[in-house]
Amino acid sequence: MKVEELRIDERIKEVLKKRGISELYPPQAEALTSGILKGENALIAIPTASGKTLIAEIAIVNRLLKEGGKAVYLVPLKALAEEKFKEFKDWEELGLKVAMATGDYDSKDEWLGGYDIIIATAEKFDSLLRHGSSWIRNVKVLVVDEIHLIGSRDRGATLEFIITQMLNRAQIIGLSATIGNPEELAEWLNAKLIKSDWRPVKLRRGVFYQGFVFWEDGKTEKFNSWEELVYDAIKRSKGSLVFVNMRRKAEKTALELSKKIRNFLTKKELRELKELAESLEENPTNEKLAKALQGGVAFHHAGLGREERVLVEENFKKGLIKVVVATPTLSAGINTPAFRVIVRDTWRYSEFGMERIPILEIQQMMGRAGRPKYDEVGEAIIVSTTEEPSTVMERYIKGKPEKLFSQLSNESILRGQILALIATFNFSSFREIYDFLERTFYAYQGKDPYTLEDRIRDIVYFLLENEFIEITLDDEIKALPLGIRTAKLYIDPMTAKIFKDTLPKIEKDPNPLGILHVISLTPDLIPLPYGKKELPMLEDEYYSFKDRLYFELDWEDERKFLRAFKTALVLNAWINEVPEGEIVEKFNVEPGDIYRIVETAEWLVYSLKEIAKTLEYSQDVINYLETLRVRVKHGIREELIPLMELPMIGRKRARALYNAGFRDLESIKNARPAELLEVEGIGAKIVEAILKHLGREVKIVQKPRKGTLDYYLHP
């Protein structure tokens, strides 16, 4: 179907023409003529790279141009929010303003009222609903990308609560991978189901077993090893994406492939890859990445820093990196297709031991094969070492993905959501809570909300006992200040209880390590794991720092305690300005893990401070916690705090300024630019920016130094 034939605003057609889109894929045409443009709900369950986002874009923009109002586009990951934000920016030329909202869960963000299209993570939007942001009543369209995550243990319940809240308030468009029970999900949403297996690039799937690829069409092809599949793709000037089940395996595999693949590269490519490797910040994880990069290979997992992940994704898309070995984080929606996808593992470790990776996830990995516009066909191959190819084929290639089931019974999330219903949506009786639950996917799947009755009563009594709520003489449930603050902080009531119980000890004897250990014990922070080899070090450190902790080692739950303790030690090293590389080496963590726990820890220290305020602790306690929050955010000692308000100044530059004698803003403001330029890591642009921030406009013209080539060319 031609774009011209669509009954949409002509201005939309112009923007699509500029993008080079004149024809729609069959599932796009089906979706856009199904009633979605008339405001009807839709569930679009089609393969990866079949143009789901474009359907949502056209539906949103057409509706907003016609009626005004707002649209919210929900994504599961911050990185995906950034990607979608860039895509939606195209529509600003039609006068629609696009904003992105992630993180900071303690804000109404009324500034978003000035925007038309808001890209947000589910958790952020859930927190905005709790804060009662006034602009939400103007939301006409809610798009839920990766809606199949409603079946995920971690985030499913949050997504389900959001959709239940918005079902009768806005048009719902769900974008999903191929799932086992789309009809059931569509019926709950009262949505038209658009289901298709059509792909813009044909997908050829097979199983590698004992030296042969057994293709689903019955053909076989000989390859001496699975690695030969990668080398073969490179000889054909194509890239490969290899999925493995563990970070360490991703790194090891990338380094092994790199040794051989460098022989296939041109001198120009080797030179560019060397430059890329040299641009990485120094730390043990990046050393391995740099080594792999020099052979045209990279690994990609959640332990990489954000900049490194972006660098890998962009250079793989460009074709400079030939192979990426990834854990399934890359298959979670980030747009990085490859000609050939190789799935090395169909099992993974979990807290319950080894378990099969779900069919849905394997099929999503395989769906990354084939790059629209570049490949006529994409190839996805599962490597089997023990199972017969026919068994693997039946299960993962011909098999139907698992059905989605509501995760509303997840106690931790249910605790927070029930408090939110009482504290921010003013539900005042058990009856109202049950009525709400009757509208959920949980109830739709035939599960009687009253089967949750015992659990809900337990949660309500927990909230009552810990002074989050009260029950009046008229049997009305009312939120108390602690309950209201906890719901708006977007933390688990159990976290708030731990804070409440520990604050008297903190007031008596405040110390950073003890506080960092407390927040690491809460359900809102996933603590760092540790291996057997680390146990002696952790036990030694525990006996050294025992007096600083507010909890003693619980031998019955030693693992939980020591994971939290290791996390606290990492955070403590971070706020004492231990270089990142040293932290990575000493504590056997990855840079990405440091960023993850720092971001969550800052939020939890802030929440602890807010709970202290609500419970009317002294200003000294509140100031102490605010100082610690800033230290956690920037990774600095206390004396550097005044310097952190300067633009372009991070922990390293702040320390360099301090050590050079610039210990406060006044001394920097009164300094000569030449003095500031002598500080390590401080260049002309930075001097101009920090002085401008302090009210001094300067323009620095740097003359070339004597003896340099530039001096002779431009004396």
Swiss-Prot record:
Where is the short sequence motif Q motif located?
1-29
Which residues, if any, are the signal sequence? none
Q: Which key words tag this protein in UniProt?
A: ATP-binding, DNA damage, DNA repair, DNA-binding, Helicase, Hydrolase, Isomerase, Nucleotide-binding
Q: Which domain of life is it from?
A: Archaea
Reaction(s) catalysed by this chain, per the record, are: Couples ATP hydrolysis with the unwinding of duplex DNA by translocating in the 3'-5' direction; ATP + H2O = ADP + phosphate + H(+)
Q: Where is this motif: DEAH box?
A: 145-148
Q: What InterPro entries does the record tag this protein with?
A: DEAD/DEAH_box_helicase_dom (IPR011545), Hel308-like_dom4 (IPR048772), Hel308_SKI2-like (IPR050474), Helicase_ATP-bd (IPR014001), Helicase_C-like (IPR001650), Helicase_Hel308 (IPR022965), Hlx-hairpin-Hlx_DNA-bd_motif (IPR003583), P-loop_NTPase (IPR027417)
For molecular function, the Gene Ontology terms on record are: 3'-5' DNA helicase activity; ATP binding; ATP hydrolysis activity; DNA binding
Coiled-coil stretches: none
Subunit structure and binding partners: Monomer.
Family recorded in the similarity comment: Belongs to the helicase family. Hel308 subfamily.
Q: What is this protein called?
A: ATP-dependent DNA helicase Hel308
**Species classification:** Archaea, Methanobacteriati, Methanobacteriota, Thermococci, Thermococcales
This chain is encoded by the gene named: hel308
